[in-house]
């Protein structure tokens, strides 16, 4: 990791927990991205290195960190590394989830190529060097993501949570 001397609050790890809803067709195998807004903005793919996709009624736990961090569980870790280039946590204004699309034939007859995702709860923790507690963002549902209901979900800081 190349440390940027101007980064005063370097991000060392990001953890994302997603509780998938209990309803029929709540889960998805479509790509999902965590986005950071602000001057340090970028997106990260939430894809587990081992295991399946987001399944109905289950929790997905994604850890983004340096490739040599044993807790990192996303694939590919070197392309989804929040430590390289170094991100300044103070330059992150908010976070969001964005659902991508991998078209599959739709058997529901809605004339779309979509695999929806029902979110019961989303929690994001951004761990920062030399800070005892992570910076937290959270949102509760149920909220659906998909072509017929929108692909992006803003996740406020817990101080602003709705």
Kindly give the residue locations of the regions a language model identified.
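Regulatory, non-catalytic segments
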Residues: 2-162
